[in-house]
């Protein structure tokens, strides 16, 4: 039961943090590129890598990794925004968003793990 509470607590704070950062960034973004989701997902990839790489206990992994990072990052919004770019026939931004998210995300997860200690 404690494990579920850790995940739920982390998820609550992760979702609230994503909501606040996303709204703040969207108000300042003047381009077609979905910068809010991109930065949130890249930051989340790095932080999750760091959390796992640092070898924290299972409880902290559940709270911060599964809970907070699971709710903070957003795969579904990334896919929705990708489809919206395609529907608007904004192919160059679509390709940039797709490739940058995967390439930079994997790189940042790797860097996080390395800095975390693995």
Curated annotation (Swiss-Prot):
GO terms for cellular component: plasma membrane. GO terms for molecular function: fluoride channel activity; metal ion binding. Na(+) is not transported, but it plays an essential structural role and its presence is essential for fluoride channel function. Keywords: Cell membrane, Ion channel, Ion transport, Membrane, Metal-binding, Sodium, Transmembrane, Transmembrane helix, Transport. InterPro entries: FluC. One of its GO terms (biological process) is cellular detoxification of fluoride. The chain crosses the membrane at residues 1-21, 33-53, 55-75, 93-113. It comes from the Bacteria. It is a multi-pass membrane protein. It is found in: Cell membrane. It catalyses: fluoride(in) = fluoride(out). Na(+) binds at residues 70, 73. The keyword Transport applies. Belongs to the fluoride channel Fluc/FEX (TC 1.A.43) family. Fluoride-specific ion channel. Important for reducing fluoride concentration in the cell, thus reducing its toxicity. This is Fluoride-specific ion channel FluC 2. It comes from Bacillus thuringiensis subsp. konkukian (strain 97-27). The gene is fluC2.
